[in-house]
Amino acid sequence: MSDTNKNVDLGKKDELIKKESAFVDLLSMEINKKIIGQKTMIERLLIGLLGKGHILLEGVPGLAKTLAINSLSNAVKGSFSRIQFTPDLLPADVIGTMIYNMKSGTFSIKQGPVFANFVLADEINRAPAKVQSALLEAMQEKQVTIGDKTFKLTDPFLVMATQNPVEQEGTYPLPEAQVDRFMLKVVVDYPKLEEEQKIINMNLSSKEDKIKPVVTTKQILTAQNLVNEVYMDEKIEKYILDLIFCTRYPEKYNLKNLSPLISFGASPRGSINLALAAKCYAFINHRGYVIPEDVREVITDVLRHRIGLTYEAEAENVTTEDVIKQIVNTVEVP
């Protein structure tokens, strides 16, 4: 939400955010005991956590995706659960079910793995649509219904779903409407050579660094509310809107060449998440105000899964990343 009060004391706000965001460095240091490299992935996890959003990670197996969210849950003193999505999984295996007790002749409720602060949905595209939608509904509503009872999910609540971009056989691709519910879609890349050398040494070492809880869930909930206090100037809001509108009407921004390549642009959910992700990025960098670089830093992960490409774009091997890059390089920066 924009701050229209012209007399806003940015200095005070900046000091407050600097003080309240100090825990971010502690969290990063703790996670880095287990994770070498993958700075972007860890930053995006923190953005998802602070922005009350969820993250879709795409990458081949073995890139520390599971380890990252597990390490984060340990450092935050939160509960963690992992759901391995398979073709025979049922919605009840995710959200929970009613169990009949023959002795007492009554039903009792068994809560599913979705009742945790940090939920890893591993290979989400391996389960049928009804299972995917059960999880995505829980993500959206922050509550689930088992039988005739509705249960609120634990706060904070972060879902990190993974999918393998290589193996597409026997998978159920997420529909556009479902993918849009993820705040960010992050493509995880291989580590650099020197990072991988450190990974080998760390895994062959007999000394194991255990992750200690350095932040409480209460601190995270306070930080989630503080993110809204990060100041965003009207010029930055206009910049965000220009970027989003450029995905819908590229010809109005002198990008006529993109019109035949884009089948649909980002929805208002894209605008909301871009503004929120920029605020979160400013917060984790200990700043009480948003600058254009914050928007440019997160835009690819916010819009990657929100822009539809035409067959023509696919034939020309044009990716959404290419489209976003062109838009960012063209739209005027305030």
Regions found by a protein language model. Name each.
Residues 17-63, 245:
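Pre-Walker A (pre-P-loop) alpha-helix and adjacent loop at the N terminus of AAA/AAA+ ATPase modules
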Residues 108-117, 146-163, 174-183:
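AAA+/SF3 P-loop NTPase mechanochemical coupling elements
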Residues 13-21, 34-35, 171, 185-257, ...:
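Conserved C-terminal "switch" segment of AAA+ ATPases
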